[in-house]
Amino acid sequence: MSRYALIVLIVVVVAANLCEASDCGPNRVYKSCGTGCPETCENPDPDCDRACHQGCFCSKGLLQDIDGNCISPDKCP
């Protein structure tokens, strides 16, 4: 019975991670090890710790605006 429970647990964890990755929204990508200091219009080159943070981040080359949207740097106010 414990082997069955382990298989179910693995399937649930994998499914949860796949759901998170698809819920990022436009111009965002899911990373299992991203920065805790996102690149923003206000701070495009943040100095941050190297700790891994899991979640959705702006796609490469985009910055996060004040509303949390990912935009190209030339669109920053």
Swiss-Prot record:
SUPFAM superfamilies: Serine protease inhibitors (SSF57567). Expressed by the venom gland. GO terms for cellular component: extracellular region. Pfam families: TIL. Disulfide bonds join C24-C56, C33-C52, C37-C48, C41-C76, C58-C70. Keywords: Disulfide bond, Secreted, Signal. InterPro entries: Ser_inhib-like_sf, TIL_dom. Residues 1-21 form the signal peptide. It is found in: Secreted. Its main location: secreted. Residues 24-76 form the TIL domain. May be a phenoloxidase inhibitor that stabilizes or inhibits venom phenoloxidase while it is stored in the venom sac. Belongs to the serine protease inhibitor-like (TIL domain-containing) family. This is Cysteine-rich venom protein 6.
